């Protein structure tokens, strides 16, 4: 229930407006070793994570969602992933929102839009979801198999799509093989180094230090894909 008056935040003593966005539950799922006898599709992992978030919240909220967001999977395409998630968690009446397929900022876009909808009073309970199964798809491809996962009608669509919905690469990039992000990132790093005026050794050391700190964060999260702390060396 949404309060009628500002709510006291006990730890800080601050008064919060009733429409202040609050994250009440978080859930994560990781499958480092694919089960090729019963391959789990992305939307199933997304639902599993949402159920974990509901347990984390300590209150049943999934079926009460006003909006369901989905960051679309790159490993298996669902035209309306948000709608599929909504139906699987019992929120069939919820509005559905999906971020655009490319950009890498889908998670943050979804959180920003969800917060805006809560502040405006358009929604009170919002679910934000996303999942991948790239390792499973790759392992199946090695065996010459294709996943037998959910296929929606081509005309299935969420209520809204947010983000820039355009091809990931233009013709010039594609013509010289700049398709995968790993190639483009290398060019960006070279441009950053040039702009900063540092030499290769300095820039390499800075990147190594950054990723060493990233790995320390991952090592503290049992749901990280590679929870191994690594040094800059």
Descriptions of predicted regions:
Residues 1-100, 116-123, 127-233:
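Conserved "HGTGT" condensation-loop signature of ketosynthase/thiolase-family condensing enzymes
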Residues 103-104:
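Short helix-initiation/N-cap motifs at beta->coil->alpha
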Residues 107-116:
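Conserved phosphate-binding catalytic cores of ATP/NTP-utilizing and phosphoryl-transfer enzymes
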């Amino acid at each position: 229930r949404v309060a009628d008056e500002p709510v006291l935040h006990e730890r800080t003593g601050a008064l919060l407006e009733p429409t202040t966005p609050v994250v009440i539950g978080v859930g994560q799922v990781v499958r480092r070793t694919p089960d090729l006898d019963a391959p789990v599709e992305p939307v199933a992992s997304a639902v599993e994570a949402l159920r974990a978030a509901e347990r984390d919240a300590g209150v049943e909220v999934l079926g009460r969602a006003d909006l369901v967001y989905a960051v679309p999977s790159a490993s298996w395409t669902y035209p309306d992933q948000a709608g599929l998630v909504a139906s699987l968690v019992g929120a069939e009446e919820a509005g559905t929102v999906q971020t655009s397929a490319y950009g890498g900022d889908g998670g943050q876009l979804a959180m920003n839009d969800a917060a805006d909808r809560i502040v405006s009073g358009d929604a009170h309970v919002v679910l934000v979801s996303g999942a991948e199964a790239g390792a499973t798809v790759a392992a199946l491809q090695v065996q010459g198999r294709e996943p037998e996962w959910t296929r929606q009608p081509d005309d299935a669509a969420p209520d809204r799509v947010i983000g820039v919905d355009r091809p990931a690469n233009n013709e010039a990039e594609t013509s010289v093989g700049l398709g995968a992000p790993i190639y483009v990132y290398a060019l960006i790093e070279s441009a950053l180094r040039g702009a900063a005026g540092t030499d290769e050794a300095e820039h390499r050391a800075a990147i190594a230090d950054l990723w060493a700190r990233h790995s320390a964060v991952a090592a503290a999260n049992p749901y990280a894909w590679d929870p191994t702390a690594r040094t800059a060396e």
